[in-house]
Amino acid sequence: MIAAIQFGLLFGVIHYLRPQNKVKPSLYWIYSLAVNALTLTMFGVGVLRIDNFALPEFSFSISNTLFITAALLQALFCRLLVKPLSRSIKVASAILVVFVFISIEYLRHHGTFEQRTLLMVVCISSLLVWQLLEQAQVRKRIESPQLIFLMYATYLELAFLCGRLAIVLTKTNVIRDIPEIPALLVFFTVGQIVMNTISYIAIGGFWAEKVAVANAITSKENIEIKSLLS
């Protein structure tokens, strides 16, 4: 259901990319939203088809890597609001994605559910901290209620991730099947995904603000031109 909400948001903002619009959403955010929605769908289908919890299908490695990719793209979007992306950041981002894929694939064969979760939580938490640092820089230059909303959503998503981390680190027995996953871990995971969705909504609102301002300026200019010609 959350994936459906994200796909709906994606289809709702695509019209901002029309050529006649002077202000267009960042493609990094669009790609992040698309990748995240696709990944949630893949996870949902994968969970329904899973046969061996100890050795999940290869698609789970792809899905986990895409989750990190979506968080990375959102972090790059926040960075782009502050300054252009340097070549070193782009190269480091590509290296991170490759590293995550190799690590997740290795843990799929030789690791546990807890180890895979730990890797994901640490990577996404690090990217969220980066996002918050960039968002703080943006707020110094741009006054926007949606940016404040985005920061709150990011803080809450990070809090849910910390909850997941605490549960995984304090759990003594190894989880070997889906029914063994603690209900509290499921709660924190769902909470994180919900906050992530809210952050996408906040960014969508931010772009809607920018488009509205640009349209208002254009309308004012058109009126001034007409008054000069009349």
Residue spans of the language-model regions?
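Juxtamembrane segments at transmembrane-helix boundaries
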Residues: 7-27, 37-180, 186, 196-197, ...
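Hydrophobic transmembrane alpha-helical segments in integral membrane proteins
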Residues: 1-7
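Cytosolic signal-transmission helices at domain junctions
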Residues: 209-228
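General nucleic-acid-binding
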Residues: 189
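Short alpha-helical H-box segment flanking the phosphoacceptor histidine in two-component systems
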Residues: 204, 228-229
